[in-house]
Amino acid sequence: MKTGIKKVKLHVKKNDSVVVISGNDKGKEGKILKVFPIKSRVIVEGVNIRKRHMRPTQGQTQGSIIEREFPIHSSNVKKS
């Protein structure tokens, strides 16, 4: 009996140039920064940018709001 997580093969990989084919960022192009094969999601440069609220730490006494890319489903992109 096998245990563990099944490896999922995606049609794109890190550093591929892709175009978003559906969603709010449809038509945007970018390079893949990171791939999450288990969840079938990818992070594309300049796509799906959201604001993230950062908590104050010992190094920074004040919190901040930063903008960064969040993952989108791999079926929403195609190689260009």
Swiss-Prot record:
GO biological process, one term: translation
Signal peptide: none
Keywords per UniProt: Ribonucleoprotein, Ribosomal protein, RNA-binding, rRNA-binding
Any single Pfam family the record assigns to this protein: ribosomal_L24
Region (Disordered): 53-80
Single GO cellular component term: ribosome
Protein function: One of two assembly initiator proteins, it binds directly to the 5'-end of the 23S rRNA, where it nucleates assembly of the 50S subunit.
Record-linked CDD domains: KOW_RPL26
Protein name: Large ribosomal subunit protein uL24
Any one Gene Ontology molecular-function term assigned to this protein's record: structural constituent of ribosome
Family: Belongs to the universal ribosomal protein uL24 family.
Quaternary assembly: Part of the 50S ribosomal subunit.
Domain of life: Bacteria
